[in-house]
Curated annotation (Swiss-Prot):
S-adenosyl-L-methionine binds at residues 113, 133-138. The gene is trmD. HAMAP family: TrmD (MF_00605). It is found in: Cytoplasm. Pfam families: tRNA_m1G_MT. Transmembrane segments: none annotated. PANTHER family: TRNA (GUANINE-N(1)-)-METHYLTRANSFERASE. It is an enzyme of class 2 (transferase). This is tRNA (guanine-N(1)-)-methyltransferase. The lineage of its organism: Bacteria, Pseudomonadati, Pseudomonadota, Betaproteobacteria, Neisseriales.
Amino acid sequence: MLIQAVTIFPEMFDSITRYGVTGRANRQGIWQFEAVNPRKFADNRLGYIDDRPFGGGPGMIMMAPPLHAAIEHAKAQSSQTAKVIYLSPQGKPLTHQKAAELAELPHLILLCGRYEGIDERLLQTSVDEEISIGDFVVSGGELPAMMLMDAVLRLVPGVLGDMQSAEQDSFSSGILDCPHYTKPLEFQGMAVPEVLRSGNHGLIAEWRLEQSLRRTLERRPDLLEKRVLIPKESRLLETIRQEQREIQS
């Protein structure tokens, strides 16, 4: 997989290309990265790529020509069809399902905005999709781009040492992950649940499913509304709800 970022701050991406599982996978050649600085495509000696907005208003707007040239340069680096994504609070929310879809693609180009925004004409002509990481605003698109990259790369075969880690993550199965424990057996008076030390894999699997359902019901009940429950999940969920009704009564 090739991922390119159109950004005026290429160095920010060192954190994801050099460290952690994504950095290791990058060194192993599982995925490649290139930062494309639109300043190199500016039509002025000083490398300006922004100007004042027509109609007035605060801040500066990133101009379409240098961004378009940077995107076209990025596309030319691969024979594979590229998907161009603009990280924007106006985009559709990034979900696990969307990350899984993007992980199947060979070439992503991530457009990182700055200042007050980007000329709308560039978005209409050069961007395939806008994606948001949440209902809030940050100073630029670089951090959202790296969050998207991390979410996508985890799902690319070979990036994680054990793909089961990704399969057990929250949202991968449509519900939240269960609690996890390691040594010591007791910490500040709290012991590791006995079932996890039993060695009975069937009981452990059922406990983990029950805990995932319980946590999802408490923290993200909206996820359960979208989920088609299998009989075991329905039975466990009804038991959990019955317990909650008894506590409230």
